[in-house]
């Protein structure tokens, strides 16, 4: 008799995705982040659901309702901090996943990569609207500053901003709609993630060498289920350590002050995972130019497959490209640091240089280095 998991219409899908999936035998731990992102998404939806049961999206009660969750709801404090720090873990996994894709040439799977870029934008949008919900000072001013950037769009900018706000400033209407967006977007992310997987399973996984591995595949279960479980345990351990020992380490103290439209915080800045893009935005003195640079800093990922000039897919055997890749990582860390600093003399020039280097590395240096490496292969 045939096994039910191979015949049942629903179980067959699960079987082909998580059990009998042919997987390259040599994929490293950098391939763990896909499953970890799935785990993060599930955790965020579950903790978010329980938070939504007690939260009120109204300017007069939003801040109090978050305080109420932390003080009066059974284990509300841990649900709230798991959700807040879970977002940080989500972005750590996301950036590692993207870095893996860049290093090993996974972007050659065009459809999978493009859905991934759309997913990144969606996750960033979700995190942004979510940060507004506690209605602290940084929530309010972050929402004001970032939505105001749209006013740089010629002709329709001002109308567009007021349409998003639902009035002439960030107010009740804005908070209510942001809560609605924050609730619906994770389900859109889930749907996109499924499409991401469908496209990936059309081609099969890449591997560290970048060489086709069709002749050397192993079943996903038990080999990679056990490997993913180890990754999941490490992720949960890190999240719990962060949540239970330093819940506010990655947050902003200003967000413990209720939103006040009459008092601007000294330094308006987003959460750490957006600081690199914020630094690029601030490094251009022109408003529209800054907005375009901000958008392009993420959108540039969609052009990565077109900028691939190497005859090899992976960077595994390309030392010069490896050097530039780690230079890019260091540059992004520098931008992240700059984004959290005030707009003053030493930081401004460092931010501008780091921003120039970011675009220069991706658009010029990496493609040119790949061409040089192609020549060197003939020696």
Curated annotation (Swiss-Prot):
Pfam families: Cytochrom_B_C, Cytochrome_B
Location of the protein in the cell: Mitochondrion inner membrane
Primary location group: mitochondrion
A single GO cellular-component term on record: mitochondrial inner membrane
InterPro entries found in the cross-reference section: Cyt_b/b6_C, Cyt_b/b6_C_sf, Cyt_b/b6_N, Cytb/b6-like_sf, Cytochrome_b, Cytochrome_b_C_euk/bac, Cytochrome_b_N_euk/bac, Di-haem_cyt_TM
Membrane topology type: Multi-pass membrane protein
UniProt cofactor note: Binds 2 heme b groups non-covalently.
Named cofactor requirement(s): heme b
Binding site for heme b b566: 97, 196
Swiss-Prot/TrEMBL GO biological process terms: mitochondrial electron transport, ubiquinol to cytochrome c
SUPFAM superfamilies: a domain/subunit of cytochrome bc1 complex (Ubiquinol-cytochrome c reductase) (SSF81648), Transmembrane di-heme cytochromes (SSF81342)
Signal peptide positions (record): none
Binding site residues for a ubiquinone: 201
Binding residue positions for heme b b562: 83, 182
Membership in a protein family: Belongs to the cytochrome b family.
Other facts: Heme 1 (or BL or b562) is low-potential and absorbs at about 562 nm, and heme 2 (or BH or b566) is high-potential and absorbs at about 566 nm.
UniProt protein name: Cytochrome b
Gene label: MT-CYB
